[in-house]
Structures are given as structure tokens and as C-alpha cells.
Amino acid sequence: MTDQSRTRFPQFYITAPQPCPYLLGRYEKKVFTHLLGDEPVSLNNALTQAGFRRSQNIAYRPACDDCQACVSVRVVVKDFQPGRTFRRILARNADLRSTPQPARATDEQYTLLRRYLDARHAEGGMADMSRLDYVAMVEDTTIATRLFEYRRPDGTLTAAALTDMLDDGLSMVYSFYEPGEPGRSLGTWMVLEHIERARALSLPYVYLGYWVDGSRKMAYKTRFRPLEALTMEGWRAHPAS
């Protein structure tokens, strides 16, 4: 087999069918490639624009036989205006301070992640994530990745977001937060914070991953409008917009 690291064109592979984590009774397949070679940053940029997501040093996208429910979506930053509910969430979290960190895992982050997973996703695919798994998720990257930490005035870590810095935007890879503060709506707030950060950096988009038609877990993404969806004709306005 050709060594991908010595070629300019990536080698793509496809997974065996696995139970779908979003739609009960469905099975998913993924096409993926390794972010290797001399230009992993430009490769990740191009693949993200083509609907791929990054997990460690792999870029993947759904390739299911009889289902197209997973749709890559991104927020159009310049046209986004927070409504009343979003403004309240922004005000509620005005005390939090954001610090961009290198992609380095810490015990403090992992402790917060465990509280989040145990409270919010105890039955999910990441429920058994170990400390070493977390280190791999954060640190196994060949591209420009940051881990944004959000802290209260007393220094307490309240939320964190693993984010890829792209040529045309920010891609939210994974985020987690303190589950004991539901009144803050921290998950929503981190998306809003990324939109404002992208605006300050003159970046046109915030990539939110996949909206899954029929999945309640992914329905929240349509609240951030205007939203674009990747279609067979390219990026177009999402129907919810």
C-alpha cells in the first residue's frame, strides 16, 4: 500500500457498519483519511469545507448506504445577530474569562470532563473515556488547534472547548462544561462566544459539525441563524434559516 505521508493525494478508507449514535435502529458508515503528509493544515481546511470533521489525526464524514440525515452546518458570522434569549445568556456569563491554551490536556480539564460526562452523557459513547483517551483527543493533532478555557473570577474552570483554527473560521471539535450550573446555559454560550471570537478575527464561519435530521440532541444547532448546510450544490441556507 502506498505510504500516504509520501503522497500529495490522501488515501481514503471506509468503516464497517456500526450502530448509529443518533438515530435508533440505524447503522452508520464513515469515510475517513489520516491528516498526515507535508500539508495537514491545508488538507484539514479543504476537508472541513467539504463536510468532514476531525477526530485526533483523522478526518471523517458519514457515508451511510440509505441515509443522508447527517448534514454539515456552519454559522454565517457577519449576519448573526443574537436575539433576546441569546443576549440574556451572554449577559449571564459576562463574568467568565476566556483563555486560549495550546492543545495540552490537564488533570483539571479531565476532572471537569468526567463531571460533565457522568451528568449529561452517562450512556453515551464517551462515557468510559479515560485520562489517556482525553490526552489523545486533545493532543493528537497536526493542525492549529486550541483549547479555550473559561473561568470564573475566582479562577474556577467552568467550561472548555477544543477548537480548530481554520482559514475561513473556527471549527468546534468538542466542548464540555460544569453540569452543576444549568442556569448559565454554558453549551449555548460557548457557541455564542465562538461566533463573537470569529467576528473579532474577521473569520466568516463557525463550523458546528453535523445537524442530524430527526435527532433531538442535534436540534439545538438550528437556533444559530443564519445557518448554512452543505448540499449536493455546495453550501446553501439551511431550511431553518
From Swiss-Prot:
Main location (coarse class): cytoplasm
A GO biological-process term: ubiquitin-dependent protein catabolic process via the N-end rule pathway
Pfam families, per the entry: ATE_C (PF04377), ATE_N (PF04376)
Catalytic activity, reaction form: N-terminal L-glutamyl-[protein] + L-leucyl-tRNA(Leu) = N-terminal L-leucyl-L-glutamyl-[protein] + tRNA(Leu) + H(+); N-terminal L-aspartyl-[protein] + L-leucyl-tRNA(Leu) = N-terminal L-leucyl-L-aspartyl-[protein] + tRNA(Leu) + H(+)
UniProt xrefs under InterPro entries: Acyl_CoA_acyltransferase, Asp_Glu_LeuTrfase, N-end_Aminoacyl_Trfase, N-end_Aminoacyl_Trfase_C, N-end_Aminoacyl_Trfase_N
Enzyme Commission number, as recorded: 2.3.2.29
Keywords linked to the UniProt accession: Acyltransferase, Cytoplasm, Transferase
Family stated for the protein in its record: Belongs to the R-transferase family. Bpt subfamily.
Stored PANTHER family: ARGININE-TRNA-PROTEIN TRANSFERASE 1 (PTHR21367), ARGINYL-TRNA--PROTEIN TRANSFERASE 1 (PTHR21367:SF1)
Listed name of the protein: Aspartate/glutamate leucyltransferase
Organism: Parvibaculum lavamentivorans (strain DS-1 / DSM 13023 / NCIMB 13966)
